[in-house]
Design a protein with these regions (language model features):
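Short beta-strand segments enriched in small/hydrophobic residues
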Residues: 105-115
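Short hydrophobic segments within beta-strands
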Residues: 110-112, 200, 306
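A glycine-rich, often tryptophan-bearing local segment used as a flexible ligand/cofactor-contacting loop or short
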Residues: 170-273, 323, 327
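Extracellular/periplasmic catalytic domains that process cell-envelope and extracellular macromolecules
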Residues: 63, 100-104, 156-160, 190-193, ...
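Low-complexity, disordered linker/stalk regions enriched in Pro/Thr/Ser/Gly
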Residues: 1-102
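Coil residues (strongly favoring Ser/Thr
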Residues: 10, 42, 89, 131, ...
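Helical hinge/lid and interdomain linker segments adjacent to catalytic or ligand-binding clefts
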Residues: 117-216
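Extracellular ligand-binding/catalytic regions of CAZymes and related secreted enzymes
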Residues: 102-104, 218, 276-338
Length: 338
């Protein structure tokens, strides 16, 4: 990966990683008889043989720590190619270090907010998980600007865990984009396989979330302002009510789920009835939980979408009626245990 995409010179992965390469032989690629790869060492007994036409390998159960990957090929005459490797110090624009992270716990926090260079939002989420789950009882994944090249790696990263907390940017610029839409197939597969997903997308324009079908959207604040003190009501339990603690200065959405697509769906948070100073009608949903029927006897995992920002990269936004940790406490203690 490019350093510009990952925000540093180190590529962090979990124990699954896919490598892809091109093959070329001037006498024709059909003359390539063997491809070999190795991890960490190029000793004569370290190489693992692949078919001569192999152009990729997905490695799993890689030991945590600093790692290197090597690949070479051999042709029918017994001539070997040069060894190519990752990381490659001659490729100054690419990652210079590859670190494999251990899988900790059954909860994954996904940081899809590359413009938060100080990681204030990640620190806030980590702090909540420290309180709810304990230190070192969860993992986190900083995506940067680009998902892994192979969707296999995206799915593997998710499938190491039972619960995924995926937060996105408070707002984006032309140079930065959320990646969750490109992870759509992996997210759907994760949910349908029994995983639970909480996702907090803010900057979106349509209802085409295959992992959470919506009937319609409404912009709650066409002027781009949602003011401090606004109460976010929970029809589940008023003790879960939240309140805006700092001005939300981006346009945000309310929504109505497409209930026909779910086996069951429930509102967790909604906006209050307008007091005349707001433009919305009724009580638009801003956080909902749904579940799908996978088969006559099996339900999917649960998917929760929250369309108000919990953090803007500087400070939390919904702390005006106690900490927003109570939302995650409710999810982990009630919804994600069923």
């Amino acid at each position: 990966p490019l350093i510009a995409d990952i925000g540093g010179d180190t590529s962090f992965t979990f124990p699954t990683r896919t490598f892809v390469w091109d093959l070329y032989d001037q006498d024709g690629n059909e003359t390539i008889t063997d491809v070999y790869y190795s991890i960490d060492d190029t000793c004569s007994s370290c190489w693992v043989r692949l078919d001569g036409q192999a152009t990729s390998i997905t490695l799993s159960d890689i030991e945590p720590g600093r790692r290197e990957f090597f690949v070479k090929c051999r042709d029918i005459a017994g001539s070997e190619s040069e060894i190519i490797y990752f990381p490659d110090s001659s490729e100054q624009n690419n990652a210079q270090v590859w670190m494999v992270k251990p899988v900790k716990g059954d909860v994954l926090i996904v940081d899809d907010y590359p413009l938060d260079n100080s990681n204030n939002a990640l620190a806030w989420y980590n702090g909540m998980m420290d309180t709810l789950l304990g230190e070192d009882q969860y993992s986190y994944w900083e995506i940067g600007d680009e998902l892994p090249f192979s969707s296999t790696d995206v799915s593997a990263n998710l499938n190491y865990f039972d619960h995924v907390i995926w937060y996105t940017a408070y707002n984006n610029t032309a140079s930065a984009n959320d990646t969750y839409n490109r992870a759509e197939a992996s997210l759907v597969n994760f949910i349908m396989s029994g995983g639970n997903l909480f996702i907090n997308p803010i900057d979106f324009e349509d209802t085409t979330f295959t992992w959470f079908p919506m009937d319609s959207l409404v912009t709650l604040n066409p002027n781009g302002r949602l003011f401090t003190g606004t109460v976010i009501e929970s029809p589940v339990d008023t003790s879960l009510n939240l309140s805006i603690s700092h001005l939300i200065a981006v346009k945000v959405k309310g929504f109505w789920p497409n209930v026909l697509e779910f086996d069951n769906v429930q509102t967790i948070y909604q906006m209050p009835e307008s007091d005349g100073n707001q433009t919305w009608l009724g009580t638009p949903t801003v956080c909902s939980i749904g579940q799908y029927r996978v088969s006559p006897i099996e339900l999917s995992g649960k998917v929760v979408i929250m369309t108000l920002p919990l953090h803007d990269g500087y400070r939390p936004k919904l702390q005006g009626n106690g900490s927003a940790i109570k939302l995650f406490q409710y999810l982990f203690e009630t919804e994600f245990t069923q």
